[in-house]
């Protein structure tokens, strides 16, 4: 798999992603975060299935998402729909001295990802719905929603948990939205051409 991983890293580098994003992808082994039957495809630039209809996004989509998120040292970051924990691990590699929270409604995935990331002391994973965010740990510098929100419906509770200044990245339909809060003013950019599993409200 070493050759396949090197090809992926070269591809991401050629797409212009930052050194810190490339280094995170180099450090974190994707094969540990996918089921055994699809490990052979770990470094193909494709989404792969997880449990109960969940997926792990293709690496180029994750790299683009992280570039929009703009994670920085010392930040508090929340991922909703953290799946197998791959993106949490990448963020942890970039934000080594920050605090990272993952909410995953699928109990099996939450348990597996906790075990995979138990040595990452700056990551905390909770098995619960992300609909209400994580108010007890708010505000967050960054919020990443890793499932498609319905009809441009970013829950207001999440926006209220965003620090000022702060950024939310949220898939809506076939687009990624970058929502930025600065001086109490909220702006939005849309990046079309993506596909995500839908936001699950109940387990």
Where are these regions (language model features)?
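Positively charged
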Residues: 142, 202-203
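Conserved nucleotide-cofactor-binding alpha/beta core module
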Residues: 66, 71-186
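Class I SAM-dependent transferase core
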Residues: 1-78, 86-90, 109-112, 117, ...
């Amino acid at each position: 798999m070493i050759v396949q991983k090197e090809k992926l890293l070269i591809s991401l580098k050629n797409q212009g992603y930052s050194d810190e994003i490339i280094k995170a992808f180099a450090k974190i082994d994707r094969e540990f975060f996918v089921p055994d039957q699809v490990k052979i495809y770990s470094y193909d630039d494709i989404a792969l299935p997880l449990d109960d209809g969940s997926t792990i996004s293709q690496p180029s989509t994750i790299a683009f998402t992280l570039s929009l998120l703009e994670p920085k040292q010392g930040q508090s970051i929340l991922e909703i729909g953290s799946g197998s924990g791959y993106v949490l691990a990448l963020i942890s590699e970039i934000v080594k001295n920050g605090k990272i929270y993952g909410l995953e409604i699928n109990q099996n995935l939450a348990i597996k990802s906790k075990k995979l990331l138990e040595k990452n002391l700056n990551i905390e994973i909770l098995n619960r719905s992300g609909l209400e965010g994580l108010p007890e740990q708010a505000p967050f510098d960054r919020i990443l929603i890793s499932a498609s929100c319905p009809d441009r419906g970013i829950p207001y509770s999440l926006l209220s948990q965003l620090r000022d200044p702060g950024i939310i990245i949220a898939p809506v339909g076939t687009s990624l939205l970058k929502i930025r809060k600065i001086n109490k003013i909220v702006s939005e950019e849309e990046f079309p051409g993506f596909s995500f599993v839908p936001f699950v409200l109940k387990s």
